[in-house]
Each structure stands twice: as C-alpha cells, then as structure tokens.
Amino acid sequence: MEYINPIISGFYPDPSICRVGDDFYLVNSSFEYFPGIPVFHSKDLINWEQIGHCISRPEQLTLRQGVPNCVGIYAPTIRYHEGIFYVISTNVAYGGKDEGNFIVWTDNPYGEWSDPVFIDLPGIDSSLFFDDDGRVYYTGAFDNGIFISELKFSYKYDENGRVTDMSCDVVSDRKVIWNGTGGNDPEGPHLYKINGWYYLLISEGGTEFCHMITIARSRDILGEYESCPRNPVFSNRSTSLPIKGTGHMDIVCDKFGDWWGVCLGNRPITYPFKHNLGRETFLVPMVWDEGGWPVIGRDGLLDEKLTENCLVGLFKSR
C-alpha cells in the first residue's frame, strides 16, 4: 500500500488538524477569499472531503474593506475540547474593519460556526492549548518570537446544557517562551503535552524555500524551553526532492497511538523554482526517539510517495 502527496492539492496552506474518535478534521488559511477557512473531514488521513467553511456569512467578518491581496485570514488552528470545536485565526487587514485574532466555535463542524470572538492579543499564527488542569493558553508569533498568554472562557447554556454563546478574556501578561533556533520569522506555534513534557513546535526560515520545522520542550508550560539537538527536525531545503518549502506543521495521534504531521509545501515545475498551485497540504509519519524527540518523515525529509514501510497502525489495519 502507498499514498502520494499532497493529500489536499491546490491552494490549501497552513494546515491544522485534530482528531475526535475515529474522525480527523483539518482547516487551512484562506486569506482574502470568501467563504473563509475551509473545513475538511477524513477517516484515514489520506482521503479528505470538504464539509464547509468556518466563515460562511458576510456578517461574520468583513473581508471587502482594507484587505488587499495576500492578507486576510491567516493560519487557523483547530482544536476540540469537551464537545466544542474551536478554530482560532487572525484577520490581517492593515487597519481595516474586523482586524485581529479571533475564535469561532461550533458543536457541529458540518454546520455553521459562531460569530467571531475577538481576543485582545497581537501577532499572527494564533493557537490554542487546553491543559489537563483546565487552564487554556494562547500562543502566537509576534516581534520575532513566540509568546504565551492564559485565556479564560465563559459560556452560556440552554436548558439542555448546550453552549449557546461564549466570551474569552486574556488573564495573564504575554511572555516570550522561545525565539527559535535563529532562523528568520519564527511562527506557526503549536503546544502539545506528551508524557509530561510541553512540546512547542514552530516554523522558521520564512514560508519559501528555506522553510523548516523546529521544536523545543519544557516541564513547565512557561519555560524554560530546551531546543531539540537535531533541529531543524523537518525541512526539504537544499535537497533535490520535488516538494519544496515544507513547514507550518501540526501533529496528531491516531487511535492506534501512531503520530502524523500535516504541513504545507509546494511543487515547483521550473527552475528557478516556480509553482502554480500554491502551497498545498501534505502528510508525513513521525515517531519518537529514545530521548523523547520526534523523528519526522524520512529522517526529517518529506517524500512525494510513501510506501507501506512508512505506514503504521491506521493503514496496515485496513
């Protein structure tokens, strides 16, 4: 058995993924285009069906005024917690209406999503992390670093206990927790708690051909974070591989305990490198080494074709 990357072809950059039971859900950036933030569903991580958009009503978010080419909705993150799907993203509008970081939510990803709940924090590439002690954290990229702030959600319920509305307050100061390994533009942060460690996965090098993934970890969510000695842990830079610009990764564990990453990349058709399908969504397997650090893809590289030797659990069971 094999599969061929990309798993979602065409203009679908900045993928983020979550799993609920047997189901995987994925979202992408949509920039100035409406409807915004496409939502996909899959049972096997290979075959994906688009099931809707997070921004589907003009009154949700203004994209017509002050939103030039290549700005708008940046880098959404999707997370699921206690029956609610959350998508956090940034509307970059250069001072236009509805600019800033926001959350939309739903209990049914096939239906409509809420109006945006704006968050008074700067930067781009916002992400949510629900800790096992009930606290919620925001990470974002700002001023050439990755920062964290604590959030507090308040909910309203109907008579059946279903959430009907929510608000979100920032309840701590911002703290820079990592500046990366020295690459340009540290961004795209995601936090995970695995075996007692807080792992901070980010992108560096810019979203062109020097793109790379780096990772750090800490026993305390606020740091200090130690950098992986093998950073960057994932990049196709300076190789002859057909997929270029790999980065902006989110990771997920399947029901068999196997780990996978989704990332963006592009497929140039000429040299100097030019690509006409934009940044696409790719899938890569990963494992953890004896020291507790991820080994992503083929020793940090993304191949176009993955064979059965790379496929574990989820696919070998079929």
Regions found by a protein language model. Name each.
Residues 1-318:
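Carbohydrate-active catalytic/glycan-binding domains of CAZyme proteins
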